[in-house]
Amino acid sequence: MTAATAQRIGQGSRSSKEDRDRRLVRYWLYAVFVVLIAIVMVGGATRMTGSGLSITEWKPIHGVIPPLNHAEWLEEFDKYRQIPQYQQINKGMSLEAFQSIFWWEWAHRMLARFVGFLVAVPLAFFWVTGRLKGGLKYRMLGLLALGGLQGAIGWWMVASGLSELTSVSQYRLAIHLTTACIIITAVFYIARGLVTYSERPAERSIQRFAGWIVFAVLVQIYLGGLVAGLHAGLTYNTWPLMDGAVIPSDLFIQSPWWRNLFENPKTVQFVHRMFAYTVLVLTVLHSLQVWKQVPGTTHARRTIVLVGLVLIQAVIGIATLLMSVPLHLGLTHQFFALIVLAFAVAHWRATKGAYEG
């Protein structure tokens, strides 16, 4: 065997090992992604069932164990009875009814704890065994830090509903939801950067537009968080007009005017609707751009799927509105928003190609 042949075999062996390592890390990130989706969906159910304030303390370690006997349940229920939500809305609630809302919030917090372990433990293993190359180590540390911050934001949100309000602040709810979606975006973006793509990266203009679409979807999710926090989906339950008007007359009844954008349920729903149309227009324009510059490519075909997903999400949103936000449609609307976000992220990453090395 010549030296050149031995060198080629050695390079092939290293390449095969690197491919295996990238695949392992990618599958791990996919698992994290799935659990993050589950957390957001359980969080949505927690919000829609009015369960988010059922646990009035933040116990990152001791909170893992729920009440185990009747006395402990009564103690937990007594804590809930001290807050305004019980006193003003749920007064007279039975212990059984309290238990049903308790389990939603407990499950949400348990999933959040679980994903912390799902990130930290494999991260340590991959780091020690040298499976994380280049900047991947620091990207993953950033995700871990962002996850810790999200836990603090979650308690900050819950705390807003324990003293004076009967529900959590819509500002904090929207921030909590959007931060979760930013983490989902980052995890999926990194995972898709470890894929081997058959097509070369798209031109910079396409990459930038794809990135702006991801940003627009995140903004729309933030606006959806405001809608959820204010129960703004119950204001105008007609479409395409809003109670017979294109632009209702009571959008700016609060002073100063900008407060309406965050605190007036009618204005918040109006903005969420209008921005939904904006996202749809952006995806159509992006598709036209890609088909003009690189027609018939995988990049172009993906944009057709993206437009289709946005259209489906719009239909789900309209149905949710017309039916006054029933639980199943509200959760479907939230889930499909995550599908749109994930596909937009996958498309954006694919236009840039895989990470080098």
From Swiss-Prot:
GO terms for MF: metal ion binding; oxidoreductase activity, acting on NAD(P)H, heme protein as acceptor
Example of a GO cellular component annotation carried by this entry: plasma membrane
- Family that this chain belongs to: Belongs to the COX15/CtaA family. Type 2 subfamily.
Source superkingdom? Bacteria
State how it assembles. Answer: Interacts with CtaB.
Note the PANTHER family from the entry.
CYTOCHROME C OXIDASE ASSEMBLY PROTEIN COX15 (PTHR23289), CYTOCHROME C OXIDASE ASSEMBLY PROTEIN COX15 HOMOLOG (PTHR23289:SF2)
The residue ranges crossing the membrane are: 24-44, 110-130, 140-160, 175-195, 209-229, 274-294, 303-323, 325-345
What is this protein's name?
Answer: Heme A synthase
Which EC numbers does the record give? Answer: 1.17.99.9
UniProt keywords (A-Z) are: Cell membrane, Heme biosynthesis, Iron, Membrane, Metal-binding, Oxidoreductase, Transmembrane, Transmembrane helix
Pfam families in the cross-refs = COX15-CtaA
List the GO biological process terms.
Answer: heme A biosynthetic process
The annotated pathway is: Porphyrin-containing compound metabolism; heme A biosynthesis; heme A from heme O: step 1/1
The way it spans or sits in the membrane comes to: Multi-pass membrane protein
Provenance organism: Brucella anthropi (strain ATCC 49188 / DSM 6882 / CCUG 24695 / JCM 21032 / LMG 3331 / NBRC 15819 / NCTC 12168 / Alc 37)
Cofactor names: heme b
